[in-house]
């Protein structure tokens, strides 16, 4: 399996086929039992756990079905955490002001400019998922990995979230890999990968 920079790739298959497992392997959240994950010429599976964490935090953004927002922190604070961790990983001092400005700007782009001080319990499902997407983007990753990002949203909100992801791909030239069971979503991807009986089909 090879994925090029700037592609939108949908991974589809029946429940339990291994879609999420493949996504987790691509993002080095899981280790493959065989084979390798090559990113920009580097075999990620051969790196130390710390180096994998460095690359994962700075180069990959993750969006999950559940928002996984920290309930005691505001939308802005939730978005900031990966950025501040990333600044340490890359050897820079935590540039809090710079990351805060970027986070506020990104939240504004998705219609949450007036919600930055709200905690997750004060946000709707769609707003929480938008916060989760912006959190995934705070380090300007080259790859966005989405696991059923609309799975827990109503149809209208789900479409809005997908439009956001497609627009980010266009404006930022990010590679997007999205796991979905929805064939309508898959139709909007540039390429569809099917997992059947443990095999990858295109």
Language model: regions and residue ranges:
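ABC family nucleotide-binding domain
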Residues: 1-188, 192
């Amino acid at each position: 399996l090879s994925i090029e920079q700037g592609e939108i790739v949908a991974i589809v298959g029946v429940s339990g086929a291994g879609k999420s497992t493949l996504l987790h392997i691509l993002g080095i959240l899981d280790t493959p039992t065989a084979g390798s994950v090559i990113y920009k010429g580097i075999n990620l599976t051969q790196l130390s756990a710390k180096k994998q964490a460095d690359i994962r935090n700075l180069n990959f953004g993750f969006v999950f079905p559940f928002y996984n927002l920290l309930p005691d922190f505001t939308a802005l604070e939730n978005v900031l955490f990966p950025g501040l961790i990333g600044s340490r990983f890359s050897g820079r001092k935590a540039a809090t002001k710079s990351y805060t400005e970027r986070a506020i700007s990104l939240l504004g782009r998705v219609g949450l400019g007036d919600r930055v001080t709200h905690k997750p319990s004060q946000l709707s499902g769609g707003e929480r998922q938008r916060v989760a997407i912006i959190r995934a983007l705070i380090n300007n990753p080259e790859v966005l990995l989405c696991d059923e990002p609309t799975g827990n949203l109503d149809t209208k909100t789900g479409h809005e979230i997908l439009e956001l992801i497609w627009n980010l791909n266009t404006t930022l030239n990010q590679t997007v890999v999205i796991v979905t069971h929805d064939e309508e979503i898959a139709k909007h991807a540039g390429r569809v990968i099917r997992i059947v009986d443990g095999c990858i089909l295109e």
